[in-house]
């Protein structure tokens, strides 16, 4: 009986469901959130100015974009669980490079982190599509965002506090613990690919072939553009908001606290999700993009009043949380089950495209204008996303 009971208990405990993936996303969020403020401030310290930081982020994002297109082939060759583990190892390598305090190793570490994030995100999204029914996706996304709110609320402050009061290495060690916990929990789950939507015998997806297939579908194309706009805004926020606060005279710990307070807006994801299910996700997206865009532009307009500008930084993040409340629902509700792997690998390029375009554009902008100009560009981009969101289906 005992030999039978233990495997059955393990099978029940590790049976994947929506809550399982929320825990997985939450652990991964701690590993990213703790570095959110630390990494840009370290970049500014090592490189000297915001324009140099933009150039490094732009260069690294090229690597991230290329890796995103190659990852589906890697997943096919070594299977998802090993691809996920490879992402964890790359994250550990990034932490080692960050801890060295060298500009070249910092850039290498940033590249490792970008590629690691791509591996982890693609694999987790594929497992979600396999195991969470399409009818539950609109509930899953707001719940996921609610449970990753705690890491993103406390992580930015925690990372800076540890770096300032103990040592930067302490922050990197803690993130290493989060990554190790993520790997242990993932392997405990013993996740397998759903044979109903996975075809092991087909060749690895060809990026040249499935890129056109993705972008000829209007709903997928719109979902990608909206996600890229959202990611660009957060890329601007995570990198340039700490730089703006630091150059405005705020200490690293205060900067971390302001970013943490701003990201506490993610706790509202469940509320926005409920409103979206009642009035439609299109309403949430149009409202969120428009409100956040206007507030972001006002940061630059009122830059001579630091207290008001800081309040607008926090307010714009809360407005942007409306957009996060919808998450990737426009894509998840549009993709066909039989081409999930191929379309997901293309869709997640929105993150790396945003990471590539944002610092690339801002490196040019900062060559002509002062740092607050990035908020004008970012806010204008969000207003454009609000206009495009009008083309989403009303019943989304």
Describe each PLM feature range.
Residues 39, 119-132, 322-335:
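Intracellular juxtamembrane helix-capping segments at the cytosolic ends
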Residues 5, 9-62, 219-258:
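Helix-loop boundary and gating motifs at the non-cytosolic
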Residues 338-367:
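A late C-terminal transmembrane helix in Major Facilitator Superfamily
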Residues 113-148:
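Cytoplasmic helix-loop-helix junction between adjacent transmembrane helices
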Residues 82-96, 176, 283-297, 379:
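Structural signature of the two symmetry-related core transmembrane helices
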Residues 1-15, 191-229:
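Juxtamembrane intracellular "pre-TM" segments in multi-pass secondary transporters
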Residues 67-79, 268-281, 366:
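Helix-to-loop junctions at the C-terminal end of transmembrane segments
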Residues 282-327:
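C-terminal transmembrane helical hairpin of 12-TM major facilitator-type secondary transporters
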């Amino acid at each position: 009986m005992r030999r039978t009971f233990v495997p059955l208990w393990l099978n029940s405990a590790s049976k994947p469901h929506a809550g399982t993936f929320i825990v997985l996303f939450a652990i991964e969020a701690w590993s990213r959130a703790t570095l959110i403020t630390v990494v840009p401030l370290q970049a500014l310290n090592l490189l000297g100015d915001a324009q140099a930081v933009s150039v490094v982020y732009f260069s690294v994002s090229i690597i991230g974009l290329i890796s995103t297109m190659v990852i589906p082939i890697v997943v096919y060759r070594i299977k998802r669980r090993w691809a996920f583990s490879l992402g964890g190892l790359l994250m550990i390598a990034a932490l080692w490079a960050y801890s060295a305090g060298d500009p070249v190793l910092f850039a290498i570490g940033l590249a490792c982190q970008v590629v690691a994030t791509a591996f982890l995100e693609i694999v987790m999204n594929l497992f979600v599509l396999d195991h969470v029914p399409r009818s539950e996706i609109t509930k899953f996304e707001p719940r996921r965002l609610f449970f990753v709110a705690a890491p993103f609320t406390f992580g930015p402050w925690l990372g800076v506090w540890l770096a300032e009061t103990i040592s930067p290495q302490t922050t990197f060690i803690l993130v290493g613990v989060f990554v190790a916990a993520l790997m242990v929990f993932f392997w405990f789950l013993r996740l397998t690919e759903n044979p109903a939507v996975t075809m092991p015998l087909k060749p690895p997806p060809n990026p040249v072939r499935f890129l056109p297939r993705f972008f000829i579908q209007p709903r997928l194309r719109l979902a990608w553009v909206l996600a890229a706009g959202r990611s660009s805004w957060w890329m601007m926020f995570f990198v340039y908001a700490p730089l703006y606060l630091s150059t405005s005279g705020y200490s690293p710990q205060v900067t971390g606290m302001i970013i943490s307070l701003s990201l506490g807006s993610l706790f509202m994801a469940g509320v926005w999700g409920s409103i979206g299910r009642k009035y439609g996700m299109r309403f949430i997206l149009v409202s969120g993009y428009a409100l956040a865009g206007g507030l972001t532009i006002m940061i630059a307009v009122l830059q001579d009043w630091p207290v008001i500008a800081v309040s607008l930084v926090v307010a714009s993040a809360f407005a942007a949380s409306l957009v996060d409340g919808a998450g990737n629902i426009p894509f998840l509700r549009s993709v066909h089950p039989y081409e999930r792997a191929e379309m997901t690998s293309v869709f997640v390029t929105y993150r790396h495209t945003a990471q590539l375009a944002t610092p690339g554009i801002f490196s040019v902008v900062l060559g002509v204008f002062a740092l607050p100009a990035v908020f004008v560009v970012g806010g204008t981009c969000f207003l454009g996303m609000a206009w495009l969101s009008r083309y989403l289906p009303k019943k989304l």
